[in-house]
């Protein structure tokens, strides 16, 4: 039987151990437990690529049901509003029975015909349909957690969603909105006058992780897969991660692969894993970040070089 690698560098995959994010996750989970009125129910996770924003959103959605919530997850792409509505309807299907979409209001003979009333909710806009869903959920004391990844201020649907969410909060609906994005994208969103109220949302910067937390996560993850890791190898891996959650998973994954068939991850495995992970990081993270830089950003970056 092939060895199962316990590290998870795949995009959006939640690692078994969320290094350095315990306090943040506990704080946001407590907000769901507290319910209406907690300021963290409107939060924005801000961080560079590889800092674990998507993984945090995913973990919170997984935990939401324990606090009496259903969740609807999406990304800031065209079709956002419909996607949130459909995900919310699907998540609440066992709790809220949909009302008949149309009723027969008239019947004529010769020629045979019928007239139908589609109902207020079916004719209504996104706010009307979401309000009906929230009423059904809130009647059972169930909240709706909406998460939006990769925020993009240029997407009009994101602005619409945020404005409507503000009305839900004013109406004291049991609803939460957690968003995540790159610093420049979040800055652009908060500068949009239509959603200036989002400036009062809780902002949680996701920076690098302390070496002690990285070391602990690496050691525990290796142990969960049935191996041990040499202390020197552990030091090499910790230094190679640079405190980035994605690099933690990547270095761990590559080092484990190098140690297949062995009981221990040694220093040579760690060095091989470090080299492979650094190449992956350059290709998948740094190159993407570089391509997004403006001409002004590039001139500034070059000026900072020694």
Question: What kind of feature is each model-predicted range?
Answer:
Residues 65-70, 81-114:
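Conserved NTP-binding/hydrolysis module of P-loop NTPases
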Residues 206-233, 240, 251:
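Conserved small helical "lid"/interfacial subdomain of P-loop NTPases
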Residues 249-306:
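Winged-helix-like regulatory helical subdomains adjacent to P-loop NTPase cores
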Residues 191-207:
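A short helix-turn-beta junction within AAA+ P-loop NTPase domains corresponding to the substrate/partner-engaging
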Residues 44, 61-80:
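Conserved catalytic segments around the Walker B and adjacent sensor/switch elements
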């Amino acid at each position: 039987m092939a060895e199962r690698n316990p590290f998870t560098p795949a995009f959006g995959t939640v690692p078994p151990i969320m290094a350095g994010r315990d306090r943040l996750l506990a704080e946001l989970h407590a907000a769901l437990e507290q319910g209406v009125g907690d300021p963290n129910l409107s939060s924005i996770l801000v961080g560079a690529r590889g800092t674990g924003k998507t993984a945090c959103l995913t973990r919170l959605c997984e935990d939401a049901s324990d606090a009496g919530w259903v969740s609807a997850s999406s990304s800031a792409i065209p079709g956002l509003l419909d996607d949130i509505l459909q995900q919310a309807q699907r998540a609440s299907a066992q709790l809220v029975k949909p009302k008949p979409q149309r009723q027969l209001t008239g019947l004529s003979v010769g020629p045979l015909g019928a007239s139908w009333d589609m109902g207020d909710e079916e004719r209504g806009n996104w706010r009307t349909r979401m309000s009906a869903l929230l009423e059904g959920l809130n009647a059972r004391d169930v909240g709706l957690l909406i998460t939006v990844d990769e925020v993009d201020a240029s997407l009009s649907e994101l602005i619409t969603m945020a404005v409507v969410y503000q009305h839900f909060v004013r109406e004291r609906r049991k609803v939460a909105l957690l968003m995540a994005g790159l610093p420049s994208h979040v800055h652009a969103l908060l500068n949009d006058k239509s959603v200036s109220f989002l400036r009062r949302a809780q902002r949680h910067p996701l920076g690098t992780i302390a070496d002690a937390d990285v070391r602990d996560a690496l050691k525990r993850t290796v142990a969960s897969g049935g191996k041990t890791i040499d202390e020197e190898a552990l030091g090499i891996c910790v230094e190679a991660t640079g405190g980035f959650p994605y690099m933690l998973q990547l270095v761990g994954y590559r080092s484990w692969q190098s140690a297949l068939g062995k009981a221990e991850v040694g220093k040579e495995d760690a060095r091989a894993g470090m080299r492979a992970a650094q190449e992956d990081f350059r290709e998948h993270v740094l190159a993407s970040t570089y391509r997004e830089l403006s001409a002004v950003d590039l001139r500034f970056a070059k000026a900072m070089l020694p």
